[in-house]
Amino acid sequence: MVAVSKTKPPEDIKELYGLGQRDFGENYVQELTEKQALLPTDIRWHFLGHLQSNKVKYIASFVHLIHGVDSLKLLKEIDKQALRCQRVIDCLLQVHIAREETKFGFDEQELDDLLTSERAGLGALKNIRIAGLMGMASFTEDQDKIRAEFKGLRSIFDKYFKGPPTAPNASQSSAPQQPPTAISSAPAPILSIGMSSDYKIAIEEGSNIVRIGSLLFGARNKA
C-alpha cells in the first residue's frame, strides 16, 4: 500500500510512519522534494502524478518508484537522470483505461509498440527498469464500469508480465517470469490500480499496489 500524502503536512506523515508505514506517494515535484528533505531517510517515495520531463532531475536521486510514465520521451529522460545519479529507477507504464480525456497514459497499441518494437529502443535504456503497469479507473460510482476497466488492464498486464501478480516483496524464486519484451528484472511485477474509493475492486482484479489517501489522512487539503 502507498499512502498518498499529497497536500498533507509532514506531521501527518510522521504519524503513519510511526505505525510502520514506509511507502508514501506524492503528486507534485516541489512538495515531494520538500518533504523528502524533512522526513526519515528510509521512507520509500513514490511519484504518482503527471511528471514533466524537465522536473525528473529533482527527484532522480531518491525516488523509489515512478507510477505514471506515459511517454518514451519521459522514459529517456528518467534514464538520463538515473545515469547521472548512478542508479536504476523503477517505473510503471501508465495505461489509459478510463474513457476520460483528462487521464494520461498509453493506449493498448502504443504500449505494445513500446514493449515489442526494437525501434522503440528500450534495450538501450540501462538505468530504468519497467516494473509493471499502472492505471486509473473512470471517476464514477458505477462499480461494474470500474471493474471492467481494471479487468482490462489486468489482461494487458498478463500479456507482458506473465503469471498472477504477487506482492512486491515476494521472494524472487516464486515470482512470475517475464517475457523478453519487458525490460524489467524486478522479482515481482507490479500492477498499480485502486485508490480509496475503489481499492477493494482493484484487489479483487489483481492489484498488488493500491494508492490510498483519504481513507488514511481524511479529506485532501487544497494545494
Residue ranges, per PLM feature:
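Cationic, low-complexity basic patches in intrinsically disordered or flexible, solvent-exposed regions
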Residues: 173, 178-179
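Divalent-metal-activated hydrolytic enzyme cores
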Residues: 208-209
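Conserved alpha/beta-domain cores
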Residues: 1-169, 183-197, 203-205, 217-220
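Active-site loop ensemble at the mouth of alpha/beta enzyme cores that anchors a bound cofactor
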Residues: 223
